[in-house]
Amino acid sequence: MYIENHLLKDTFAGRSAKQLHCNKKSGLLEYPDMIVLHYTAGGNAMSSAHYLARADTDASAHLVIARDGGIIQLLPFDTIAWHAGQSEYAGRTNLNRYSIGIEMDNAGELHRREGKFYSWFNREYMPDEVYTDCINGRARYWHLYTKEQIMTVYAVCRLLLKADPIHYIVGHSEITNRKLDPGAAFPLKQFREQLLKINNP
């Protein structure tokens, strides 16, 4: 897999990136130095990608990563996407102007009812799909990411780090207090430390 003309080309783990047209453009993303990781909080990758591509949806992203590791690209990497919203990090605001947005197909925070786990859209998840986090003595439940997803996101981020001077890899929750993604089930700290060694050995 490689980047050509700001689009992913060829295959990774036997899968090629699908291109889904998204006409929501806010200008040129000239010097991205940040990657923002999100979860879709949706039912599946393709439905989330189509939702983000819709003209009447006030959001978009560069990529959606499916649970099997498949990639859907909505926008070229040199185009501003609407993924960060009202945001602030490292002294800057409006981070869509500086960042590449990657959405991962994941239901997000789950809720436990009568020993079972459900998403906000009322889909049940089996216990082996659930990550349990405990904050201040209170258990919180999250939809697990798949190994294939994490491997694909890592590979894409490596390509982006080679193509652009990326200095920051952050979760959406780190740039705004309105969001929780990518949530406690994503190993963000280790992921970030390993990747940023590429540009800062």
Regions found by a protein language model. Give the residues of each.
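Active-site-adjacent loop/helix surface patches within enzyme catalytic domains
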Residues: 2-167
